[in-house]
A protein has these predicted regions:
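Conserved alpha/beta-domain cores
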Residues: 1-215
């Protein structure tokens, strides 16, 4: 599903954000119908990075109760200043171990777990905070050097070691398809993702995420 930025002029009201969300959900439903998939199995995660507090508050009023951020310290500031909203914050970007302490304090979900060093750093900080964290293992199914994530062949060994980190609740895999009009290259990545998915650990649940970004 292709969503160009030009398709989504910046919304200026709760009503406009709600209308944008409805349009995206309709497109998701249509795509699911073509694929023979239940739309309820797809979760839309609006991304609020660089979006100011006023517009985020409008987005929440329009029904966005889970938001994605890839700049950890910016996300923590937002979580603290908007604690009254009850937003579930999902960290979607690559994480350095020295930023694990921030994620452990506020995030409900981390979608880019790709090393045991990060798993250990999160485990230690979550113990101090007495919290748990939902995580997705990031897999580089497109084989692009510019992207983070495990190679599909490394997933099985990696996930077998994750039960040692009991503060991490493994929910599934996260991957980004290659951005190209060449359909077969995209499908090849999908096949690699399917192979990697068969390696998830016993305590994990399958997680399916549609990455689409309506502008808040």
């Amino acid at each position: 599903m292709s969503l160009a930025a030009a398709d989504w002029p910046v919304a200026q009201s709760v009503e406009q954000i709600a209308a944008n969300l409805a349009t995206v959900h309709q497109r998701i439903a249509s795509a699911c119908a073509r694929a023979g998939r239940d739309p309820a199995s797809v979760r839309l995660l609006p991304v609020s990075k660089t979006v100011d507090e006023a517009r985020i508050r409008m987005a929440v009023a329009a029904g966005c109760h889970q938001l994605g951020e890839n700049k950890v310290q910016e996300a923590q500031r937002k979580a603290e200043s908007m604690a009254d909203l009850g937003v579930h914050w999902s960290v979607i970007g690559h994480l350095q171990t020295n930023k694990a302490r921030y994620v452990a304090r506020f995030a409900s979900e981390f979608q880019a777990l790709d090393s045991l060093r990060v798993a250990e750093a999160l485990q230690q900080r979550l113990l101090l905070e007495d919290r748990t964290l939902d995580v997705f293992v990031q897999v580089n199914t497109s084989a692009e050097p510019s992207k983070y994530g495990l190679e599909p062949a490394a997933v099985a060994d990696f996930v077998q070691q994750l039960p040692a980190f009991d503060r991490l609740r493994v929910r599934g895999l996260m991957t980004l398809a290659i951005f190209t009009p060449e359909v077969e290259r995209v499908r090849a990545g999908g096949r690699r993702r399917a192979a990697a998915a068969r390696s998830r650990p016993p305590q994990s649940a399958p997680g399916r995420i549609c990455w689409a970004r309506p502008r808040c």
